[in-house]
Every structure is written in C-alpha cells, then in structure tokens.
C-alpha cells in the first residue's frame, strides 16, 4: 500500500517534528548533492532548525561563502540592470511628456493669439480661425444654457415666494376674522351679563321689567 498524502501544516508534537526534520533534511541535502554531481551545478543550501541549529551544504570545490559572494554580485548586477532599464524608460517617458507639453503650450499660444509666428501659411490661419469660431460658438451656447437655467431658477423662486405670500395672506385673514368673531362674542357676553345684573337690581327694588319690542319698561310693584 502506498503512503497516504501528508497534510502540509506545522507538526504540533515536538518529537514527531524533530524526527520529520531530520529525515527531510537528510533527503534534502542528498538531493542537493545529486543535483551538483549529476548536473555539474554549484549548489549551496543553508537550513536552520526550529532550535536555531545550522545545517549547510556546498558543492565542492567552492566553499559556501564564495558561493554567497557570487550570489550577491549576480543579484546586484541584475538589480542594477533593472534599475538602469527603469531609468531609461523614465527618461523616455519624461521626454515624451515634455514634448507633448511643449506642443500643447504652442497650440494654446496660437489659439489665444499670443504667438502666431509659428503659423506660416494661410491654410493654417484658416484652420485656426475655424477652431476659434467653433470654440466661441460653444462658449455662446454654454452661456445661453446657463442664462436660461438662471432665469428658470428665478422664475421658480418667484413662484415659490408668490405662493408663500398667498398662504400667509390667507392665514392672516383667517386670524383677523377669528379675532373679530372672538371680540364680538366677548362683547355680546358682556352685554348679556350687564343686562342680567341690571335686571336683578330692578327686581330687588320691586320693579317689574317687561321687554316690549326694542325697549324695556319698568313698573313699580
């Protein structure tokens, strides 16, 4: 029976982890030696255990420090080549952007009339005139659009203010009408109260009070 697939995760048991490390390390260094012998390659391996113990291998006849030095020089040269290539690309991009900026500035000066010395033919002037007329037409169209929008906003604002004024007028009218009605009711109540008081006084004095049409008549008893 074949060995089952081992799940690639940290071995929690310390003893099993140490045993596995020893076996895998030996096999790994053996494979490195085979690669160096069979392929005539310079191979260097550095391994630190979880306890910090160093294990290394270097294919003869070089020593590990010589191999590290060669690695450092090679990677440094590679980084320098990549840096130089990036610098060249950056210089090319900067040059392209500068040329584009110069062209845009020259075009802007021509369109504003600040520098027409670069325009040497009638056709170029005619083309520039058409561009300016087109730009001016767009400016007028945008101006008309903004003015129409402002007028519409003012109309809506005026309509809103007018509606608010009408509402306030109706509210004020209702309040005034309610005040008048309230005053009339209070006046009527006061008149009735005074009449009742006068009637009571007359009755106490021995008068008979009879209302005839719109007048009051008193008879002494």
From Swiss-Prot:
Keywords associated with the record: DNA-binding, Nucleus, Transcription, Transcription regulation
Subcellular location: Nucleus
Ranges of residues in domain MADS-box: 1-61
Superkingdom of this protein's organism: Eukaryota
Gene Ontology cellular component terms for the protein in this record: nucleus
Residue ranges the record marks as coiled coil: none
Tissue/organ expression: Ubiquitous.
Secretion signal span: none
A single GO molecular function term of this UniProt record: RNA polymerase II cis-regulatory region sequence-specific DNA binding
Family matches, as InterPro entries: MADS-box/MEF2_TF, MEF2-like_N, TF_Kbox, TF_MADSbox, TF_MADSbox_sf
PROSITE patterns found in the cross-reference section: K_BOX (PS51297), MADS_BOX_2 (PS50066)
GO biological process: positive regulation of transcription by RNA polymerase II; regulation of transcription by RNA polymerase II
Every K-box domain range: 87-178
PANTHER family the record matches: SERUM RESPONSE FACTOR HOMOLOG
Reported function: Probable transcription factor.
Annotated protein name in UniProt: MADS-box transcription factor 30
Species the sequence originates in: Oryza sativa subsp. japonica
